[in-house]
Each structure stands twice: as C-alpha cells, then as structure tokens.
A protein has these predicted regions:
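Anionic, Ser/Thr-rich low-complexity intrinsically disordered regions
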Residues: 1, 16-19, 36-39, 66, ...
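Hydrophobic/aromatic-rich alpha-helical bundle segments in the mid-to-C-terminal region
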Residues: 116-117, 121, 136-183
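Secondary-structure edge/capping motif, primarily at the C-terminal ends of alpha-helices
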Residues: 73, 110, 161-165
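Hydrophobic alpha-helical connector segments
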Residues: 53, 64-100, 147-150, 172
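Short alpha-helical scaffolding segments that buttress acidic/His motifs in well-ordered protein cores
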Residues: 88-89, 103, 107, 150-157
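Helix-turn-helix
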Residues: 7, 11-53
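Amphipathic alpha-helical packing segments from all-alpha helical-bundle domains
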Residues: 63, 94-104, 111-138
Length: 184
C-alpha cells in the first residue's frame, strides 16, 4: 500500500514538474503512475491534500539526495566544494529536472497557501545546516550566511537552466567564483 502511494506521488511530481500546476489532476497523475483511474483520489481526497502530500514527499526525496551528497568526506578546499555543488546542480537540472521544477511550483503554490511555507522552510533549513558545516570546515567567517548566499545562487542558476535551457550549461565557474569570493 505504501509503495502504491509513493508511486502516485512520484508521478504527481513528474506531472507537476513537467506539465505545470494546471495539469496536476487526478486523471493526469493516475495516467502517469500507470495505476487504475481513481487511485490518486483514494489517497488524496482533494487537491490540497495532494499538494500537501507532494510537499512531504519532495522533502523526503531531497533529504535522501542531500544525505548522498554529504555522505562522503567533507570537501577540503573550494575546488572540491565547487565540484560537489556543480554535480548536484547538474543533477537537479538534468535527471531530476522535473522534481526541481516541481519544487519551484510548490514554492509558488505557497504564495496562495502560506501553510505550505513551514514544511518547505524545513527542507531549506536541512540543506542550510549541511552546507553550513561544509563552509565552516573550509574556514568561512559566517558559514550560515555564506550557505544561504550559495543556496540562493543555486536556486537562481537552476531556475535559469529550467526556464532557458543552455546546451552548454556549465555552472562551475560561477559557483567557484562565488565560493572564492565568500571564502576569499
């Protein structure tokens, strides 16, 4: 039962991220998930419940992503950190493109549904906590503030790549330059 719910939520993220909020319907999710008609509505009785489920599911997936990224040894210099962050951003705008677009769509949804902000903020805080430790390890005088600046840059770079895709997308020079400026 839990696996079917996860299958529905994965499909809903794909629909939201690939086709936009207007296409996030029970029928579209059922079709994308390859499940019988009515399955999504059995788990989520209305659109608000589906969106709430999407936020929770997205946070779980992103938590696992950050655990994978931070599982190894902490970067020992700016170059290593730039490489790690670049890999993450390329993944977010490549294989995980729909999920990243869905995250932005859910953030926009929070302008109409402020109650979503707390959960979305928890996800951002988890990323900030991990990044802050890396930046502290590299000698940042204000690691939390520097991490917030880095995450804002990554959001902007991801948003640009999602909305105006460049075939030659190479975020590393910008990331490396930003980190050098912060950690200088």
């Amino acid at each position: 039962m839990a696996r079917r719910r996860e299958q529905v939520l994965d499909a809903a993220l794909e629909v939201l991220g690939s086709e936009g909020a207007r296409r996030l319907t029970y029928q579209a999710v059922d079709t994308a998930a390859g499940v019988p008609s009515g399955t999504t509505s059995n788990y989520f009785r209305n659109r608000a419940a589906l969106v709430d489920g999407l936020v929770d599911h997205l946070l779980t997936l992103e938590h696992h992503d950050w655990e994978r990224v931070t599982a190894g040894a902490a970067p020992t210099d700016v170059g290593e950190l730039a490489d790690e962050v670049t890999r993450f951003l390329r993944h977010a705008t490549g294989p995980a493109r729909a999920r990243t677009a869905a995250r932005f769509a859910l953030r926009l949804e929070s302008t109409a549904r402020p109650e979503l902000r707390a959960a979305l903020a928890r996800g951002r805080e988890a990323a900030t906590a991990r990044g802050t430790e890396w930046l502290r390890h590299l000698g940042s005088a204000t690691p939390r503030r520097h991490c917030e600046i880095l995450l804002d840059h990554l959001d902007g770079a991801a948003f640009r790549q999602l909305t105006f895709p460049a075939d030659d997308f190479d975020p590393r020079p910008g990331i490396h330059g930003l980190l050098n400026g912060l950690l200088g």
